[in-house]
C-alpha cells in the first residue's frame, strides 16, 4: 500500500508508480530525488534575484536558512537536476490548482511543468534537456496525459523553452499583476 506522499499529489488515479523513480540520465544531466546535500543549492535558488524576477521576487537568505528543511524538495513530482554531481536546478510536475486561471479540462487538475535553475546554469540548454527528460518520463508513466505550462509573457526565455518543448499556446490572461502565457503539450508524439 502506497501512502499519499509516495505518489504525485492528486495523481494516484493516473496509476503512477511509487515516487521517486530511478534517476533519469541524459547526455549531461541526472534527474533524481532531493538529498540533504542539495540544501545549499535550494537556498541559493530561492534567494536569487534573477530566479525570482518572474516569481514575485527572491526570499531572504535568513528566512530560507530558517525554513528550508534538511532535505528540501523531497516530495513527489520534484526532480533535482544535477550536473557533475551538483544540483543546478529542479523540474516539477504538479497538479495545477483548480482555483487558478488557465485550464484545458472542465474539471481542471492538469499536470503542470515547472522548473527553476541557478543563473550560472542559464543559456547552456540544461533546462531544455532536463524538462524534456522529465516530460519523457511522464509520457512513459502516463501515456496520452497532457501537460500544461504557464509563464509570464515578459519571460522571453521561458516562452522560447515552452515552444522548444512542444507547448502550444492555449490562452493568455492576467494573474499576479502580469500577463501570463498558458500552453499545453500532448504526450503523444507524432510518428513519421
Model-found features: residue ranges?
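GNAT-family acyltransferases
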Residues: 1-120, 133-137, 141, 146-152, ...
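Conserved active-site alpha-helix within GNAT-family acetyltransferase domains
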Residues: 128, 154-170
Amino acid at each position: 500500500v502506497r501512502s499519499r506522499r509516495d505518489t504525485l499529489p492528486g495523481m494516484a488515479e493516473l496509476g503512477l508508480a511509487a515516487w521517486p523513480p530511478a534517476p533519469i540520465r541524459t547526455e549531461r544531466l541526472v534527474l533524481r530525488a532531493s538529498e540533504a546535500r542539495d540544501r545549499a543549492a535550494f537556498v541559493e535558488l530561492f534567494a536569487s534575484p534573477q530566479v525570482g524576477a518572474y516569481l514575485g521576487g527572491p526570499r531572504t537568505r535568513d528566512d530560507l536558512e530558517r525554513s528550508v528543511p534538511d532535505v528540501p524538495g523531497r516530495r513527489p513530482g520534484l526532480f533535482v537536476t544535477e550536473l557533475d554531481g551538483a544540483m543546478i536546478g529542479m523540474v516539477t510536475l504538479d497538479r495545477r490548482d483548480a482555483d487558478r486561471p488557465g485550464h484545458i479540462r472542465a474539471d481542471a487538475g492538469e499536470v503542470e511543468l515547472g522548473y527553476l535553475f541557478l543563473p550560472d546554469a542559464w543559456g547552456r540548454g540544461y533546462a531544455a534537456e532536463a524538462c524534456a527528460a522529465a516530460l519523457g518520463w511522464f509520457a512513459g508513466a502516463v501515456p496520452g496525459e497532457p501537460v500544461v505550462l504557464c509563464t509570464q509573457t515578459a519571460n522571453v526565455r521561458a516562452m522560447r523553452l515552452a515552444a522548444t518543448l512542444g507547448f502550444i499556446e492555449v490562452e493568455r490572461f492576467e494573474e499576479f499583476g502580469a500577463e501570463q502565457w498558458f500552453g499545453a503539450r500532448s504526450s503523444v508524439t507524432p510518428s513519421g
